[in-house]
């Protein structure tokens, strides 16, 4: 694995990767970072498809069963444990950074963001917001604009608000997600 490892996770309900997530993946690939991804349907498979189509090979599919449920030809590692949350916890401990593609409701993805003790970029699946979460800073949950001002489409929100909770867990709980 490269020195920098990215834990990519997301909601199972998501059917396509938002443009902002694709841009983040392109930057990750350009820097040659190792990507850890799970073996579930939804975002895990979408991520694998995108990386496979790009010919990117610095990918490890993590799983708890004897074989991954979904693997599009990448290296894989069986993680000790019997629950999918064991796999998520392993990836959270192993990664330096995280990328989450979140539907805004999935408690599993929210918990994955909270597990990471480092920076996480969370892209909202409706492609309207991008959230920078940094559990080690004083600002634990910051909304940053998804795009630069888009005069041709005033419906694209540019949102700068933050919860000064100091911890991602508290910020997620403000949104009704228990970690």
Language-model region placement:
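Acidic/glycine-enriched connector segments
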Residues: 2-3, 14-127
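Short, hydrophobic/glycine-enriched beta-strand segments
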Residues: 4-12, 131
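A broad, low-specificity signal marking well-ordered, structured residues that form hydrophobic/aromatic
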Residues: 6, 59, 156-157
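Short recognition patches in nucleic-acid-associated and regulatory proteins
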Residues: 128-152
């Amino acid at each position: 694995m490269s020195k920098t490892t990215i834990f990519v996770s997301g909601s199972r309900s998501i059917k396509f990767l938002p443009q902002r997530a694709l841009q983040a993946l392109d930057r990750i690939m350009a820097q040659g970072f190792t990507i850890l991804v799970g073996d579930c349907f939804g975002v895990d498979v979408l991520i694998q498809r995108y990386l496979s189509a790009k010919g990117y090979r610095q990918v490890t599919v993590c799983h708890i069963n004897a074989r991954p449920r979904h693997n599009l030809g990448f290296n894989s590692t069986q993680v000790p444990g019997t629950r999918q949350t064991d796999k998520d916890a392993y990836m959270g401990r192993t990664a330096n950074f995280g990328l989450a593609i979140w539907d805004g409701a999935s408690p599993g993805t929210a918990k994955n963001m909270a597990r990471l003790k480092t920076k996480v970029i969370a892209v909202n699946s409706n492609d309207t917001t991008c959230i920078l979460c940094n559990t080690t800073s004083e600002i634990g949950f910051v909304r940053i604009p998804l795009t630069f001002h888009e005069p041709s489409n005033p419906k694209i929100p540019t949102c700068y608000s933050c919860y000064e909770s100091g911890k991602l867990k508290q910020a997620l709980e403000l949104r009704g997600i228990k970690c």
